[in-house]
């Protein structure tokens, strides 16, 4: 603006800046009144959003499917409710790969000379669900990175995989890969009525001690439970 006011992106930063402008007498009165008006509008929007979230929580309180999905880290109330409302019967997808592809979080494939190359994600399908999955993936990735920095000895198997993936391909690609994994696991949870268990892979590996890791990765989603998918993640 003509007053050189710059506001960083982010709801918290905007609220903080508006409060600063409102109380800064270095700016004209009309600028401070405008900041107050905008701050009040933001407050009203916050109240409406909070009421919408409470309404969704009331509607989903007794929904066992929503409860199962929320057991998966990275899947919150809004994401679980949106998945249930949008996907419907997950059995319409042959496997978890198809479900992830329907959200546009699988890489494009193109071949030349008998070789297959993977490109950027397709970005097809429901953009809102894709956004929710990616945001959830970012949350769990950030949590894993913070834990790796402060208490690396407490990382679990899946968090260690996330940290290594982030080091190998970078933050944004890692987040999309994690979102893809979440989508495949959500498909398994929906079709089998399973609750997520981060340690379930231990029982699965004990029962399949003679199966090499490569066989796990080559198996189809129809042959894998959420426990096996967790084991295949690493």
Task: Give the ranges of each region predicted by the language model.
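A detector of single, family-specific signature residues
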Residues: 1-234
């Amino acid at each position: 603006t003509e007053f050189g006011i710059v506001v960083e992106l982010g709801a918290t930063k905007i609220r903080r800046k508006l409060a600063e402008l409102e109380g800064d007498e270095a700016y004209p009165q009309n600028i401070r009144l405008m900041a107050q008006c905008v701050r009040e509008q933001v407050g009203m929007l916050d109240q409406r959003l909070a009421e919408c979230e409470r309404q969704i929580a009331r509607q989903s309180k007794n929904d066992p499917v929503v409860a199962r999905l929320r057991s998966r880290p990275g899947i919150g109330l809004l994401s679980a409710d949106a998945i249930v409302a949008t996907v419907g019967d997950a059995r319409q997808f042959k496997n978890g790969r198809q479900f992830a592809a329907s959200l546009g979080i699988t890489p494009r494939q193109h071949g030349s000379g008998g070789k297959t190359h993977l490109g950027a994600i397709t970005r097809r399908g429901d953009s809102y669900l894709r956004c929710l999955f990616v945001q959830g993936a970012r949350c769990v990735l950030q949590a894993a990175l913070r834990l790796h920095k402060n208490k690396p000895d407490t990382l679990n198997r899946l968090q260690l995989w996330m940290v290594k993936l982030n080091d190998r391909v970078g933050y944004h690609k890692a987040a999309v890969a994690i979102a893809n994994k979440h989508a495949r696991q959500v498909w398994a949870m929906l079709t089998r009525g399973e609750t997520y268990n981060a340690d379930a892979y231990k029982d699965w590996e004990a029962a399949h001690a003679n199966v090499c890791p490569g066989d796990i990765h080559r198996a189809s989603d129809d042959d894998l439970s959420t426990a096996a998918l967790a084991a295949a993640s690493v």
